[in-house]
Amino acid sequence: MSEQQTMSELKQQALVDINEANDERALQEVKVKYLGKKGSVSGLMKLMKDLPNEEKPAFGQKVNELRQTIQNELDERQQMLVKEKLNKQLAEETVDVSLPGRHIEIGSKHPLTRTIEEIEDLFLGLGYEIVNGYEVEQDHYNFEMLNLPKSHPARDMQDSFYITDEILLRTHTSPVQARTMESRHGQGPVKIICPGKVYRRDSDDATHSHQFTQIEGLVVDKNVKMSDLKGTLELLAKKLFGADREIRLRPSYFPFTEPSVEVDVSCFKCKGKGCNVCKHTGWIEILGAGMVHPNVLEMAGFDSSEYSGFAFGMGPDRIAMLKYGIEDIRHFYTNDVRFLDQFKAVEDRGDM
């Protein structure tokens, strides 16, 4: 058998073996069989010793060409095996996107959170700044800076959680206003709202809680008038309860404002005709307000002959109870999913 015939048969057999290799391990064995140090192609070089010198270069070239041909076939088969393996893996891991996905329960904002954010958004649009303060407060800022000295009889109006004689849980967010006025007097107008939790020694029932939320507002500037306060409160009432709402101001008393008023809104359920919500009066009380007392301005460093201001305070708990017909304030704090899920449905309808 000639060398040419031997190489031709070797090539054909190598191609058959390569095509029959069904995995990378089998293909590696074929490579060793033909191209390894002791492989068939390497063995052809042993035939060169029996060839005339003038034929050796041509023979060596043909052996190298055969080696390259087999290597190319091996590389091609290798790529094919890798592709087949990947396709098989993809087929096994295929996700049927036509199937319905897993239902993921999505929560919703707590009704108090939504009410607070609604109020905050309104006042941010009016140029107010949101200021937060300490929940553990000094008696000085919680009472004395608000025209409530230790001897003032109005202190009996609200029982407090005292930690020491001078430290307590704040009973309102008014200390934030006092601290802000004290730190900013002489720096221009003050225009802030102060949301947060407050604490009072009340027995928990349907309308009272030892912990609840409050939002207070404060404006201090030159020539601030009662009419400015009334216009602000009218806008607030329409935003919270509907564009056709009206407000009513009734004289009242707060130590830190003078004059002081209670603010009522026309009943959004009966349109002022009288119902169980408004106790058949046509009006619902929503907040307290007034012009900042000159003593409060002076204690904070403002000249009360030059500056004036108004303040107001409301309970988002009460606002939310009125808006959504909630009869017991304790529902807000008991984490009852059955209660909270009702507001998820309202939110989905876009009513909140």
Swiss-Prot record:
Pfam families hit by this protein: Phe_tRNA-synt_N (PF02912), tRNA-synt_2d (PF01409)
UniProt catalytic activity: tRNA(Phe) + L-phenylalanine + ATP = L-phenylalanyl-tRNA(Phe) + AMP + diphosphate + H(+)
Co-factor binding comment: Binds 2 magnesium ions per tetramer.
Residues annotated as binding Mg(2+): 258
Cellular compartment(s): Cytoplasm
Assigned GO CC terms: cytoplasm
InterPro entries: aa-tRNA-synth_II, aa-tRNA-synth_II/BPL/LPL, Phe-tRNA-synth_IIc_asu, Phe-tRNA_ligase_II_N, Phe_tRNA_ligase_alpha1_bac, Phenylalanyl-tRNA_Synthase, tRNA-bd_arm
Keywords: Aminoacyl-tRNA synthetase, ATP-binding, Cytoplasm, Ligase, Magnesium, Metal-binding, Nucleotide-binding, Protein biosynthesis
The UniProt record lists the keyword Ion transport: no
UniProt GO MF annotations: ATP binding; catalytic activity, acting on a protein; magnesium ion binding; phenylalanine-tRNA ligase activity; transferase activity; tRNA binding
Name the UniProt record assigns to this protein: Phenylalanine--tRNA ligase alpha subunit
